[in-house]
């Protein structure tokens, strides 16, 4: 009976270490995905610097129709009302 308890405890101990190893693998995968996400945001920011001149004209026209002034930042068109009543 003591042998069964010993082997059961040994199996539990080994499975605990095996699970601990899997957690580090999962953590590495999460870190890898997170770093890819950060790289994607950096790429998008770099593209916005190139794409903004094309979008700038559209933004100016769009805001001009609202009688406002437009500015493009990171593919985001912001309309600002000048002067005001």
UniProtKB/Swiss-Prot annotation:
Residues 1-20 form the signal peptide. GO terms for molecular function: potassium channel regulator activity; toxin activity. Keywords: Disulfide bond, Ion channel impairing toxin, Neurotoxin, Potassium channel impairing toxin, Secreted, Signal, Toxin, Voltage-gated potassium channel impairing toxin. Residues 49-85 form the BetaSPN-type CS-alpha/beta domain. The keyword DNA repair does not apply. Residues 21-37 form a propeptide. InterPro entries: Long_scorpion_toxin_alpha/beta. Pfam families: Scorpion_toxin_alpha-beta (PF14866). GO terms for cellular component: extracellular region. Expressed by the venom gland. Its main location: secreted. It is found in: Secreted. Disulfide bonds join 52-72, 59-77, 63-79. Belongs to the long chain scorpion toxin family. Class 2 subfamily. This is Neurotoxin beta-KTx 17. It comes from Lychas mucronatus (Chinese swimming scorpion). The lineage of its organism: Eukaryota, Metazoa, Ecdysozoa, Arthropoda, Chelicerata.
